[in-house]
Amino acid sequence: MSLDINQIALHQLIKRDEQNLELVLRDSLLEPTETVVEMVAELHRVYSAKNKAYGLFSEESELAQTLRLQRQGEEDFLAFSRAATGRLRDELAKYPFADGGFVLFCHYRYLAVEYLLVAVLSNLSSMRVNENLDINPTHYLDINHADIVARIDLTEWETNPESTRYLTFLKGRVGRKVADFFMDFLGASEGLNAKAQNRGLLQAVDDFTAEAQLDKAERQNVRQQVYSYCNEQLQAGEEIELESLSKELAGVSEVSFTEFAAEKGYELEESFPADRSTLRQLTKFAGSGGGLTINFDAMLLGERIFWDPATDTLTIKGTPPNLRDQLQRRTSGGN
Protein backbone atom coordinates (compact mmCIF):
# COMPACT_ATOMS: atom_id res chain seq x y z
CA MET A 1 0.00 0.00 0.00
CA SER A 2 1.50 3.30 -1.15
CA LEU A 3 0.70 5.37 1.95
CA ASP A 4 3.02 8.07 3.24
CA ILE A 5 2.46 9.87 6.54
CA ASN A 6 3.28 13.57 6.51
CA GLN A 7 2.34 14.40 10.10
CA ILE A 8 0.41 12.58 12.79
CA ALA A 9 -0.77 13.71 16.24
CA LEU A 10 -2.47 11.79 19.03
CA HIS A 11 -4.32 13.16 22.06
CA GLN A 12 -6.77 11.73 24.59
CA LEU A 13 -10.17 12.54 26.04
CA ILE A 14 -10.86 10.92 29.43
CA LYS A 15 -14.38 10.80 30.81
CA ARG A 16 -14.14 11.54 34.55
CA ASP A 17 -17.88 11.85 35.20
CA GLU A 18 -21.13 12.63 33.38
CA GLN A 19 -20.23 16.29 33.03
CA ASN A 20 -16.50 16.39 32.35
CA LEU A 21 -14.13 15.18 29.65
CA GLU A 22 -10.50 15.70 30.57
CA LEU A 23 -7.98 16.65 27.88
CA VAL A 24 -4.60 14.92 27.71
CA LEU A 25 -2.55 16.61 24.98
CA ARG A 26 0.78 15.44 23.59
CA ASP A 27 3.61 17.94 23.41
CA SER A 28 5.05 16.46 20.24
CA LEU A 29 3.96 14.71 17.07
CA LEU A 30 4.09 10.94 16.74
CA GLU A 31 7.05 9.55 14.86
CA PRO A 32 5.92 7.64 11.73
CA THR A 33 7.45 4.35 12.84
CA GLU A 34 6.67 1.09 11.09
CA THR A 35 4.00 0.33 13.70
CA VAL A 36 2.38 3.75 13.30
CA VAL A 37 2.35 3.42 9.50
CA GLU A 38 0.74 -0.04 9.78
CA MET A 39 -1.92 1.36 12.11
CA VAL A 40 -2.77 4.24 9.75
CA ALA A 41 -2.81 1.88 6.76
CA GLU A 42 -5.29 -0.37 8.58
CA LEU A 43 -7.46 2.61 9.53
CA HIS A 44 -7.37 3.82 5.91
CA ARG A 45 -8.34 0.36 4.64
CA VAL A 46 -11.21 -0.08 7.12
CA TYR A 47 -12.54 3.44 6.55
CA SER A 48 -12.37 3.19 2.76
CA ALA A 49 -14.45 0.00 2.80
CA LYS A 50 -17.34 1.51 4.79
CA ASN A 51 -20.36 3.39 3.49
CA LYS A 52 -19.84 7.08 4.13
CA ALA A 53 -21.80 10.30 4.08
CA TYR A 54 -20.44 13.26 2.12
CA GLY A 55 -20.21 16.87 3.15
CA LEU A 56 -18.61 20.26 2.69
CA PHE A 57 -17.44 23.00 5.04
CA SER A 58 -19.72 25.90 5.87
CA GLU A 59 -18.33 29.40 5.47
CA GLU A 60 -18.23 29.75 9.28
CA SER A 61 -16.36 26.49 9.90
CA GLU A 62 -13.69 27.17 12.51
CA LEU A 63 -11.94 23.91 11.68
CA ALA A 64 -11.74 24.83 8.00
CA GLN A 65 -10.34 28.26 8.84
CA THR A 66 -7.61 26.91 11.12
CA LEU A 67 -6.84 24.06 8.71
CA ARG A 68 -6.42 26.56 5.90
CA LEU A 69 -3.97 28.55 8.05
CA GLN A 70 -2.08 25.37 8.87
CA ARG A 71 -1.87 24.47 5.18
CA GLN A 72 -0.51 27.95 4.46
CA GLY A 73 2.20 27.48 7.07
CA GLU A 74 0.83 30.02 9.54
CA GLU A 75 0.23 27.37 12.22
CA ASP A 76 2.04 24.10 12.88
CA PHE A 77 0.24 20.77 12.76
CA LEU A 78 0.64 20.01 16.46
CA ALA A 79 -0.92 23.33 17.52
CA PHE A 80 -3.74 22.79 15.02
CA SER A 81 -4.46 19.31 16.40
CA ARG A 82 -4.35 20.45 20.04
CA ALA A 83 -6.81 23.29 19.42
CA ALA A 84 -9.10 21.04 17.37
CA THR A 85 -9.13 18.41 20.14
CA GLY A 86 -10.26 21.10 22.56
CA ARG A 87 -13.16 22.03 20.27
CA LEU A 88 -14.04 18.36 19.85
CA ARG A 89 -14.14 17.98 23.64
CA ASP A 90 -16.53 20.96 23.86
CA GLU A 91 -18.88 19.40 21.29
CA LEU A 92 -18.73 15.91 22.79
CA ALA A 93 -19.52 17.25 26.25
CA LYS A 94 -22.98 18.26 24.99
CA TYR A 95 -23.97 14.63 24.45
CA PRO A 96 -24.65 12.03 27.15
CA PHE A 97 -23.14 9.21 25.06
CA ALA A 98 -19.68 10.85 25.07
CA ASP A 99 -17.19 8.18 26.10
CA GLY A 100 -13.87 9.80 25.37
CA GLY A 101 -11.04 8.01 23.60
CA PHE A 102 -7.85 8.64 21.67
CA VAL A 103 -8.13 11.49 19.16
CA LEU A 104 -6.05 10.96 16.04
CA PHE A 105 -5.15 13.58 13.43
CA CYS A 106 -3.22 12.22 10.48
CA HIS A 107 -2.10 14.09 7.38
CA TYR A 108 -1.09 11.48 4.83
CA ARG A 109 -0.78 10.86 1.11
CA TYR A 110 -2.25 7.88 -0.70
CA LEU A 111 -1.96 7.43 -4.48
CA ALA A 112 -1.06 11.10 -5.07
CA VAL A 113 -4.01 12.36 -2.99
CA GLU A 114 -3.51 14.18 0.31
CA TYR A 115 -5.89 13.47 3.19
CA LEU A 116 -6.52 14.66 6.71
CA LEU A 117 -8.09 11.91 8.78
CA VAL A 118 -9.67 12.64 12.17
CA ALA A 119 -10.77 9.73 14.35
CA VAL A 120 -11.74 8.97 17.93
CA LEU A 121 -10.50 5.47 18.75
CA SER A 122 -11.27 3.28 21.74
CA ASN A 123 -8.94 1.01 23.68
CA LEU A 124 -10.30 -2.49 24.28
CA SER A 125 -9.12 -5.17 26.67
CA SER A 126 -8.22 -8.66 25.55
CA MET A 127 -5.87 -11.55 26.33
CA ARG A 128 -2.54 -12.65 24.87
CA VAL A 129 -0.28 -15.66 25.24
CA ASN A 130 3.35 -14.71 25.98
CA GLU A 131 6.55 -16.55 25.09
CA ASN A 132 6.22 -18.68 28.26
CA LEU A 133 2.71 -19.71 27.20
CA ASP A 134 1.18 -17.72 30.01
CA ILE A 135 -2.04 -15.81 29.43
CA ASN A 136 -1.78 -12.10 30.16
CA PRO A 137 -4.11 -9.12 29.74
CA THR A 138 -3.47 -6.73 26.88
CA HIS A 139 -5.10 -3.72 25.19
CA TYR A 140 -5.61 -2.81 21.56
CA LEU A 141 -7.11 -0.02 19.45
CA ASP A 142 -10.55 -0.97 18.16
CA ILE A 143 -10.06 0.21 14.58
CA ASN A 144 -12.61 -2.14 12.98
CA HIS A 145 -15.51 -0.71 14.98
CA ALA A 146 -14.50 2.96 14.99
CA ASP A 147 -17.53 5.07 14.06
CA ILE A 148 -16.34 8.56 14.97
CA VAL A 149 -14.21 9.13 11.88
CA ALA A 150 -14.02 11.84 9.23
CA ARG A 151 -11.65 12.36 6.33
CA ILE A 152 -10.96 15.46 4.28
CA ASP A 153 -9.63 15.08 0.75
CA LEU A 154 -7.22 18.01 0.93
CA THR A 155 -6.37 17.74 -2.77
CA GLU A 156 -10.04 17.98 -3.79
CA TRP A 157 -10.77 20.73 -1.25
CA GLU A 158 -7.95 22.95 -2.47
CA THR A 159 -8.26 22.34 -6.21
CA ASN A 160 -12.06 22.19 -6.42
CA PRO A 161 -13.57 24.19 -3.53
CA GLU A 162 -17.07 23.98 -5.07
CA SER A 163 -17.05 20.20 -4.66
CA THR A 164 -19.71 18.62 -2.44
CA ARG A 165 -17.74 15.46 -1.66
CA TYR A 166 -14.29 16.42 -0.35
CA LEU A 167 -15.35 15.68 3.22
CA THR A 168 -16.58 12.24 4.27
CA PHE A 169 -17.70 10.86 7.61
CA LEU A 170 -19.32 7.77 9.08
CA LYS A 171 -22.95 7.95 10.09
CA GLY A 172 -22.37 5.85 13.21
CA ARG A 173 -24.58 3.25 14.82
CA VAL A 174 -28.35 3.61 14.83
CA GLY A 175 -29.59 5.54 17.84
CA ARG A 176 -26.38 7.50 18.36
CA LYS A 177 -26.20 11.07 17.10
CA VAL A 178 -22.57 10.64 16.09
CA ALA A 179 -23.08 12.43 12.80
CA ASP A 180 -24.74 15.39 14.55
CA PHE A 181 -21.91 16.33 16.88
CA PHE A 182 -19.23 15.51 14.32
CA MET A 183 -20.84 17.80 11.76
CA ASP A 184 -20.94 20.53 14.42
CA PHE A 185 -17.27 19.95 15.23
CA LEU A 186 -16.29 20.00 11.56
CA GLY A 187 -18.50 22.99 10.81
CA ALA A 188 -19.91 21.13 7.84
CA SER A 189 -23.18 20.37 6.11
CA GLU A 190 -24.17 17.30 4.16
CA GLY A 191 -23.19 17.39 0.51
CA LEU A 192 -23.53 14.71 -2.12
CA ASN A 193 -26.16 12.14 -1.11
CA ALA A 194 -24.64 8.92 -2.43
CA LYS A 195 -27.60 6.77 -1.38
CA ALA A 196 -30.03 9.07 -3.23
CA GLN A 197 -27.80 8.94 -6.32
CA ASN A 198 -27.84 5.13 -6.22
CA ARG A 199 -31.63 5.06 -5.76
CA GLY A 200 -31.96 7.42 -8.73
CA LEU A 201 -29.75 5.11 -10.78
CA LEU A 202 -31.95 2.11 -9.98
CA GLN A 203 -35.08 4.01 -11.00
CA ALA A 204 -33.41 5.20 -14.21
CA VAL A 205 -32.37 1.63 -15.09
CA ASP A 206 -35.91 0.31 -14.54
CA ASP A 207 -37.43 3.11 -16.63
CA PHE A 208 -34.76 2.66 -19.31
CA THR A 209 -35.57 -1.05 -19.73
CA ALA A 210 -39.31 -0.34 -19.67
CA GLU A 211 -39.03 2.26 -22.44
CA ALA A 212 -36.92 -0.17 -24.47
CA GLN A 213 -39.85 -2.63 -24.15
CA LEU A 214 -37.68 -5.48 -22.92
CA ASP A 215 -39.27 -8.67 -21.64
CA LYS A 216 -38.84 -9.84 -18.05
CA ALA A 217 -35.72 -11.93 -18.68
CA GLU A 218 -34.07 -9.16 -20.69
CA ARG A 219 -34.82 -6.60 -17.98
CA GLN A 220 -33.26 -8.81 -15.33
CA ASN A 221 -30.20 -9.35 -17.52
CA VAL A 222 -29.75 -5.58 -17.77
CA ARG A 223 -30.11 -5.23 -13.99
CA GLN A 224 -27.46 -7.93 -13.56
CA GLN A 225 -25.17 -6.08 -15.99
CA VAL A 226 -25.58 -2.86 -14.03
CA TYR A 227 -24.99 -4.66 -10.73
CA SER A 228 -21.84 -6.39 -12.03
CA TYR A 229 -20.36 -3.11 -13.26
CA CYS A 230 -21.23 -1.20 -10.08
CA ASN A 231 -19.97 -3.99 -7.82
CA GLU A 232 -16.67 -4.12 -9.70
CA GLN A 233 -16.29 -0.36 -9.19
CA LEU A 234 -17.12 -0.76 -5.50
CA GLN A 235 -14.60 -3.55 -5.00
CA ALA A 236 -11.92 -1.51 -6.78
CA GLY A 237 -12.65 1.54 -4.64
CA GLU A 238 -13.78 3.47 -7.72
CA GLU A 239 -16.92 5.50 -8.34
CA ILE A 240 -19.76 4.66 -10.72
CA GLU A 241 -19.09 6.47 -14.01
CA LEU A 242 -22.28 7.08 -15.98
CA GLU A 243 -20.45 7.21 -19.31
CA SER A 244 -18.73 3.87 -18.65
CA LEU A 245 -21.99 2.30 -17.50
CA SER A 246 -23.72 3.60 -20.61
CA LYS A 247 -21.13 1.81 -22.77
CA GLU A 248 -21.85 -1.40 -20.86
CA LEU A 249 -25.51 -1.01 -21.82
CA ALA A 250 -24.92 -0.21 -25.48
CA GLY A 251 -27.41 -2.08 -27.64
CA VAL A 252 -30.21 -2.13 -25.07
CA SER A 253 -31.88 0.83 -26.75
CA GLU A 254 -31.35 3.15 -29.69
CA VAL A 255 -30.85 5.92 -27.12
CA SER A 256 -27.78 5.70 -24.87
CA PHE A 257 -28.32 5.40 -21.13
CA THR A 258 -26.60 8.75 -20.46
CA GLU A 259 -28.84 10.51 -22.99
CA PHE A 260 -31.92 8.85 -21.49
CA ALA A 261 -30.96 9.81 -17.91
CA ALA A 262 -30.25 13.42 -18.90
CA GLU A 263 -33.45 13.78 -20.94
CA LYS A 264 -35.67 12.36 -18.19
CA GLY A 265 -34.13 14.57 -15.50
CA TYR A 266 -32.88 12.03 -12.94
CA GLU A 267 -30.23 14.54 -11.82
CA LEU A 268 -27.49 11.93 -11.67
CA GLU A 269 -23.90 13.11 -11.25
CA GLU A 270 -21.36 12.14 -13.92
CA SER A 271 -19.78 9.97 -11.25
CA PHE A 272 -20.77 9.07 -7.70
CA PRO A 273 -19.85 6.49 -5.03
CA ALA A 274 -21.54 3.10 -5.08
CA ASP A 275 -23.84 2.23 -2.18
CA ARG A 276 -23.72 -1.51 -1.51
CA SER A 277 -27.09 -1.89 0.21
CA THR A 278 -28.96 0.06 -2.47
CA LEU A 279 -27.30 -1.71 -5.40
CA ARG A 280 -28.20 -5.09 -3.94
CA GLN A 281 -31.81 -4.31 -4.87
CA LEU A 282 -30.89 -4.82 -8.53
CA THR A 283 -30.65 -8.57 -8.00
CA LYS A 284 -32.36 -9.24 -4.66
CA PHE A 285 -35.59 -8.56 -2.81
CA ALA A 286 -35.05 -8.32 0.94
CA GLY A 287 -36.91 -7.06 3.97
CA SER A 288 -37.52 -7.74 7.64
CA GLY A 289 -39.94 -6.75 10.35
CA GLY A 290 -42.38 -8.20 12.82
CA GLY A 291 -40.23 -11.29 13.37
CA LEU A 292 -40.05 -12.04 9.64
CA THR A 293 -36.97 -11.84 7.40
CA ILE A 294 -37.23 -12.53 3.65
CA ASN A 295 -34.46 -12.51 1.05
CA PHE A 296 -34.71 -13.94 -2.47
CA ASP A 297 -33.31 -13.51 -5.98
CA ALA A 298 -35.27 -11.01 -8.07
CA MET A 299 -35.59 -13.51 -10.94
CA LEU A 300 -37.82 -15.73 -8.75
CA LEU A 301 -40.59 -13.14 -8.57
CA GLY A 302 -43.38 -14.31 -10.83
CA GLU A 303 -41.89 -17.79 -11.17
CA ARG A 304 -41.74 -19.39 -7.72
CA ILE A 305 -42.67 -16.36 -5.64
CA PHE A 306 -45.85 -14.35 -6.23
CA TRP A 307 -47.02 -11.13 -4.61
CA ASP A 308 -50.67 -10.06 -4.48
CA PRO A 309 -50.66 -6.30 -3.75
CA ALA A 310 -54.41 -6.28 -3.06
CA THR A 311 -54.04 -8.56 -0.04
CA ASP A 312 -50.32 -7.93 0.57
CA THR A 313 -49.74 -11.67 0.38
CA LEU A 314 -46.52 -13.36 -0.69
CA THR A 315 -46.88 -16.93 -1.99
CA ILE A 316 -43.79 -19.16 -2.14
CA LYS A 317 -43.89 -22.33 -4.22
CA GLY A 318 -41.15 -24.74 -3.21
CA THR A 319 -39.36 -24.04 0.06
CA PRO A 320 -35.60 -24.50 0.63
CA PRO A 321 -34.82 -28.06 1.87
CA ASN A 322 -33.40 -26.94 5.22
CA LEU A 323 -36.47 -24.78 5.90
CA ARG A 324 -38.81 -27.57 4.80
CA ASP A 325 -37.03 -29.99 7.15
CA GLN A 326 -37.47 -27.61 10.09
CA LEU A 327 -41.16 -27.13 9.28
CA GLN A 328 -41.77 -30.87 8.99
CA ARG A 329 -40.04 -31.63 12.28
CA ARG A 330 -41.90 -28.87 14.08
CA THR A 331 -45.36 -29.81 12.73
CA SER A 332 -44.87 -33.57 13.18
CA GLY A 333 -43.99 -32.94 16.82
CA GLY A 334 -47.33 -31.31 17.41
CA ASN A 335 -45.78 -27.93 18.32
From Swiss-Prot:
NCBIfam families referenced in this protein's UniProt entry, alphabetically: PRK00378.1 (NF001557)
Entry protein name: Nucleoid-associated protein YejK
Chain segments annotated as coiled-coil in the UniProt record: none
Any one annotated GO CC term: cytoplasm
Intracellular or extracellular location(s): Cytoplasm, Nucleoid
Molecular function GO terms recorded: double-stranded DNA binding; single-stranded RNA binding
Pfam families linked to this entry: NA37
InterPro entries: Nucleoid_associated_NdpA (IPR007358)
Keyword Transcription regulation among record annotations: no
Family: Belongs to the YejK family.
UniProtKB keywords: Cytoplasm
